[in-house]
Design a protein with these regions (language model features):
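N-terminal assembly/interaction segments in proteins that build large macromolecular machines
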Residues: 4-232
């Protein structure tokens, strides 16, 4: 069997698994394995075993994520990174427009390229905030330039540094990578499109999955790859 045939069989299986997840909404991977594979009377596990025997490659379903509602997606590099991003739209009819579709894809590409850890400041766990503040306090204590500064000034500096942390790690606060379309942060970009469409749009969550997550893998610069893709 040639590589092309193996790839086509694998992609057909992946598509079938995705359709099965959409149709049955399994609670987890173990539940998914026992569901009937899309369009057949065989389970996902049985179908996977057939595929393994057919193409001679050992495989297993490790994870999946599902989002409901208004969702935009982006797949990078033939499946190396996949993104889903959810929106609340006051006038849901606007979600069917070309402008919304482009905005959703651009935000999903942002997530693929910049890998934000959180949606917004409120999404950052309290323990993470405290950990970052502890690190900042230790750094400032070791900095001779900070020794003579009043507490109020130190507090302001610390707040500024935390703001930088949020800007780097929270999607809505990140600088929008498509500066050719909008200069500002992601929430500003979304707000600008919402204004153009005459409705309210709010980001409500995202999922970013990278091929090989949890496995040993080589480092890749997705921000650079996506920038090249944007610039042609």
């Amino acid at each position: 069997m040639c590589i092309r045939d193996r790839n086509e069989k694998f992609m057909s299986f992946v598509e079938g698994v995705a359709k099965t997840i959409l149709a049955t909404n399994p609670a987890d991977v173990e539940a998914l394995k026992e569901e009937k594979f899309d369009g057949t009377d065989r389970t996902v596990t049985e179908t996977l075993n057939d595929l393994v025997l057919s193409i001679g490659e050992n495989m297993k379903v490790r994870r999946f994520e599902r989002m409901d509602g208004i969702v935009s997606t982006y797949i990078h590099g033939g499946g190396s990174v996949g993104v889903m991003v959810g929106f609340d739209v006051a006038d849901e009819s606007k979600a069917a427009t070309a402008e919304f579709d482009a905005m959703g894809k651009n935000v999903a590409m942002q997530i693929a390229a910049m890998s934000p850890a959180y949606l917004d400041e409120a999404s950052v766990p309290a323990e993470v905030v405290e950990h970052e503040k502890t690190i900042l306090a230790a750094q400032m204590k070791e900095d001779p330039k900070m020794a003579s500064k009043p507490e109020a000034v130190l507090a302001k500096i610390a707040a500024g540094k935390m703001g930088k942390y949020y800007k780097e790690n929270c999607l809505v606060d990140q600088e929008f990578v498509r500066s050719d379309l909008f200069q500002g942060d992601v929430k500003g970009y979304v707000a600008s499109v919402a204004k153009e469409l005459g409705t309210e749009i709010k980001l409500n969550g995202f999922i970013r999955m990278m091929k090989g997550d949890g496995l040993e893998k080589r480092e890749e610069n997705f921000a650079e790859e996506i920038a090249k893709q944007i610039n042609g």
